[in-house]
Curated annotation (Swiss-Prot):
Cofactor note: Binds 1 copper ion per dimer.
Assigned EC number: 2.7.13.3
Presence of the UniProt keyword Disulfide bond in the record: yes
Tissue: Leaves, flowers and fruits.
Annotated Cu cation binding sites: C80, H84
Protein name as annotated: Ethylene receptor 1
Function, as annotated: May act early in the ethylene signal transduction pathway, possibly as an ethylene receptor, or as a regulator of the pathway.
Organism: Solanum lycopersicum (Tomato)
GO CC annotations, alphabetized: endoplasmic reticulum; endoplasmic reticulum membrane
Entry superkingdom: Eukaryota
Topology in the lipid bilayer: Multi-pass membrane protein
Residue ranges of domain GAF in the record: 173-321
Reaction catalysis annotation: ATP + protein L-histidine = ADP + protein N-phospho-L-histidine
């Protein structure tokens, strides 16, 4: 009340000071008038303070978009306050000036109020939209919160997947993989039980193979045709199943409701190509079944991210199992391969031992058979040159011919043996091809004339005279093939033709593997031997190049089989990068043997260096060996006697010794030739040759050294040449052969017989 009295006195003083005219018609209730004065004063005060506050906060805000609207509101409020302040004087009489002052703010207030009202029509929707945007942003923020929750859940799921994948793939043992999967799933998802059912080998049942808590006996089986199993196997997603289904009844019954159960299939690798002992044969069903159970004492349910985690883990388990299966198969294959390698290594060693044993046997047989054959042939040849009755001469010739045939057979066996084990190599050199054909013709012609067969030789004009190849093996092929033609022909003729094979004649449909490639450095020689003999049936032709075969036609003629000849010829032709075959129109129509071999062409730069001249038959019978001093060293008494008999028959003065020391003690400058058997047991005959070289020095002052051996291998020949021997003679030796060797040795100072 005191404040009102003070306000009343203040207003009274204001009225008195302004000389206001009080309307005498106003109500006389002074108390009401005082309250109106007080109200207008405070309204004006509020109106003046509100704009100040607006201006203050707008200046503090940098983002408010409606500053000019606030200016209008401020003006409107200030003017409203001014009108209320002016109303303090309206209760008394006032002058015209006061009326003008009162009217002006009211007019301005009216104007600003109308403008502000009009502007609010446009501003209010924006203000409402701000509220709408606020609600939208709140909704968006809530959605972002949910998405962030999903992302966090996915990250958590991904972390668990990575962790589980790492644990699963940390091993390639399938038992460890499956046990680790159950343990990690149980720990990550807080499961009460987790089990894996595997198909049996028959594929008709699922067998309980692994469990998490180990409370259930492993080995339980359920039929694979159960509806719940078909439902799970029919999709690659997790399927919720009843806790009472046969595959889920794995936990003991309790007072709580069982938790939710889900199942998912686990694809298994198709094992048709793998034979793993305890893995099922998967023909129709290729899945295992994984069952996962939530705890029974909670109201927990499966979430989407948990189901996705289970699906991903099932796929990872499938991949890990496939890797484990492949690893197991690889290990099994490795073990099997190791066993096979051990067996192969054992077989290889046995084969090598067999080859060595065979070679040793052949070497011994070669030496041991050539030594008695040397005596037979040498003595037979000596008898042949004595005065004999016709009957005796026929018997001696038969013995000599049979012995030579046996020697040829031994050579063929040794050649075939070396061909089969790959130890035989061609002796490549330059030789006169024309002279070789003429020599073969001169050797075959006397044999054919006995059977009244005509042998003709035809060499084409473009055939090179000098070629590069194995002269000895080519002659062996020709003698074998031409010899067979003469052997199986009773009458008619045998023709030999040789020419350079053209490109169109190199291909043979019977041998598609033979592919000839001519070049400037070599050519292909084609040789055809045609006879008018008994002929061959088509079905017998493929067997002719087999060892010791005999066709039906040959059996009826009592001519014998082809022996090893053609088989060896085929091997020689193959070594010469060629091809051999036989053509015949049938029995009684003759046959044609054809072979193609590859020969080199000597370079023009080397043509002037060729030391070869056409070989003419040497007239060894004209050379005299009377008084020629020869020393023979051989431990075999029979062989010593035979060799001495041959040399004595030729007129030589022969001294024989049986040991190394005796040979070195006896040999002198008077001895022109030393013949030694290099196959003597326990004696290094090569050392004897070295000592003779050292003792007598120069070649013209020492005797010529010749090796007499039954060994036909290349090593023996190379060893003889290495120690400086002047020649090699192969047993057996006839009188004619010994005369030829001595003549060549004395004439040229060297003799080599391969």
């Amino acid at each position: 009340m005191g404040s009102l009295l003070r306000m009343n006195r203040l207003l009274s003083s204001i009225v008195e000071s302004c000389n206001c005219i009080i309307d005498p018609q106003l109500p006389a209730d002074d108390l009401l008038m005082k309250y109106q004065y007080i109200s207008d004063f405070f309204i004006a005060l509020a109106y003046f303070s509100i704009p100040v506050e607006l201006i203050y906060f707008v200046k503090k805000s940098a983002v408010f978009p409606y500053r000019w609207v606030l200016v209008q509101f401020g003006a409107f409020i200030v003017l409203c306050g001014a009108t209320h302040l002016i109303n303090l004087w309206t209760f008394n009489m006032h002058t015209r000036n006061v009326a003008i002052v009162m009217t002006t703010p009211k007019a301005l207030t009216a104007l600003v109020s109308c403008i502000t009202a009009l502007m609010l029509v446009h501003i209010i929707p924006d203000l409402l939209s701000v509220k709408t945007r606020e609600l939208f942003l709140k909704k968006k923020a809530a959605q972002l919160d949910r998405e962030m929750g999903i992302i966090r859940t996915q990250e958590e799921t991904g972390r668990h997947v990575r962790m589980l994948t790492h644990e699963i793939r940390s091993t390639l043992d399938r038992h460890t993989i499956l046990k680790t999967t159950l343990v990690e799933l149980g720990r990550t998802l807080a499961l009460e039980e987790c089990a894996l059912w595997m198909p049996t080998r028959t594929g008709l049942e699922l067998q309980l193979s692994y469990t998490l808590r180990h409370q259930n006996p492993v080995g339980l089986t359920v039929p694979i045709q159960l509806p719940v199993i078909n439902q799970v196997f029919g999709t690659n997603h997790v399927v919720k199943i009843s806790p009472n289904s046969p595959v889920a009844r794995l936990r003991p019954a309790g007072k709580y409701m069982p938790g939710e159960v889900v199942a998912v299939r686990v694809p298994l690798l198709h094992l048709s190509n793998f034979q793993i002992n305890d893995w099922p044969e998967l023909s129709t069903k290729r899945y295992a079944l994984m069952v996962l159970m939530l705890p029974s004492d909670s109201a927990r349910q499966w979430h989407v991210h948990e189901l996705e985690l289970v699906e991903v883990v099932a796929d990872q388990v499938a991949v890990a199992l496939s890797h484990a299966a492949i690893l197991e198969e690889s290990m099994r294959a490795r073990d099997l391969l190791m066993e096979q390698n051990v067996a192969l290594d054992l077989a290889r060693r046995e084969a090598e031992m067999a080859v060595r044993a065979r070679n040793d046997f052949l070497a011994v047989m070669n030496h041991e058979m050539r030594t008695p054959m040397h005596a037979i042939i040498a003595l037979s040849s000596l008898l042949q040159e004595t005065d004999l009755t016709p009957e005796q001469r026929l018997m001696v010739e038969t013995i000599l011919k049979s012995s030579n045939l046996l020697a040829t057979l031994i050579n063929d066996v040794l050649d075939l043996s070396r061909l089969e084990d790959g130890s035989l190599q061609l002796d490549i050199g330059t030789f006169n091809l024309h002279a070789l054909f003429r020599e073969v013709h001169s050797l075959i012609k006397p044999i054919a004339s006995v059977k009244k067969l005509f042998v003709t030789l035809s060499l084409s004009s473009d055939l090179p005279e000098y070629v590069i190849g194995d002269e000895k093996r080519l002659m062996q092929i020709l003698l074998n093939v031409v010899g067979n033609a003469v052997k199986f022909s009773k009458e008619g003729n045998v023709s030999i033709s040789a020419f350079v094979a053209k490109s169109d004649s190199l291909r043979d449909p019977r041998a598609p593997e033979f592919f000839a490639v001519p070049s400037e450095n070599h050519f292909y020689l084609r040789v055809q031997i045609k006879d008018t003999g008994i002929g061959i049936t088509p079905q017998d032709i493929p067997n002719l190049f087999s060892k010791f075969t005999q066709s039906q036609a040959l059996a009826t003629t009592n001519s014998g089989g082809t022996g090893l000849g053609l088989a060896i010829c085929k091997r020689f032709v193959n070594l010469m990068e060629g091809h051999i075959w036989i053509e015949s129109e049938g029995l009684g129509k003759g046959s044609t043997a054809i072979f193609i071999i590859k020969l080199g062409i000597p370079g023009r730069a080397n043509e002037s260096k060729l030391p070869f001249v056409t070989k003419l038959p040497a007239n060894h019978t004209q050379m005299s060996f009377q008084g020629l001093k020869v020393l023979v060293m051989d431990e075999n008494g029979v062989s010593r006697m035979v060799t001495k008999g041959l040399l004595t028959h030729l007129g030589c003065d022969v001294t024989t010794v049986g040991s190394r020391d005796e040979c070195l003690r006896v040999v002198t400058h008077e001895h022109k030739v030393v013949i030694m058997d290099v196959s003597m047991q326990g004696i290094d005959c090569y050392e004897v040759a070295v000592v003779i070289h050292e003792r007598f020095g120069k070649r013209h002052g020492r005797p010529l050294i010749v090796a007499l051996t039954g060994n036909t291998d290349r090593v023996t020949k190379e060893n003889c040449m290495r120690v400086g021997m002047d020649g090699v003679i192969l047993k057996p030796v006839s009188v004619y052969k010994m005369r030829s060797v001595l003549s060549e040795l004395l004439e040229h100072g060297v003799v080599l017989e391969s």
